[in-house]
């Protein structure tokens, strides 16, 4: 992505301000729609596993924390993508039924400084690991090896008070409302 693209967050997420708005709103262009499958990965203490990543090179944006997950491939169900992504990003092998029912589908819109925008829906499942879970990053893609800064378990209250950017837009509010007291 070109360095003139900067997203704007909604809600309680920290704001990354646009440098300008297009003079003609009709000139906005919808770049793409992206479906993602993500997992609320919890440990027995109720802490949430998150991965801190860079944006695409050249954006100049600050890093953000994401749950394990990624894009749904063509011909793949959301559940199949969640199982695949969980293995690729954490090394954790689970059967689809272990993820249970879809917990959340969070639509989002990323607006860029050029006036262009992307839309998407992040679909979330929940899984609780056993105390002996060990993170395995051996299945990461080259992009993940380049983009991942760190990963860790977060107490939800600490995360929400940290000032860290959590994505996608709207996720911080969901965590605050549905994972309170953890």
Please annotate each region the language model reported.
Residues 2-6, 57-58, 63, 133-182:
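Nudix hydrolase/Nudix homology domain
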Residues 2-45:
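Acidic, metal-coordinating catalytic segment for phosphate/diphosphate chemistry
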Residues 20-29, 110-115, 138-140:
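Short, P/G- and charge-enriched loop/turn segments at secondary-structure junctions
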Residues 29-32, 61-64, 115-121, 143-148:
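A generic structural micro-feature
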Residues 43, 106-137:
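Active-site-adjacent beta-strand/loop module that shapes the phosphate/pyrophosphate-binding cleft
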Residues 47-89:
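Conserved Nudix-box catalytic region and its N-terminal flanking loop in Nudix hydrolases
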Residues 93-104:
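A short coil-to-beta-strand element that immediately follows conserved catalytic motifs
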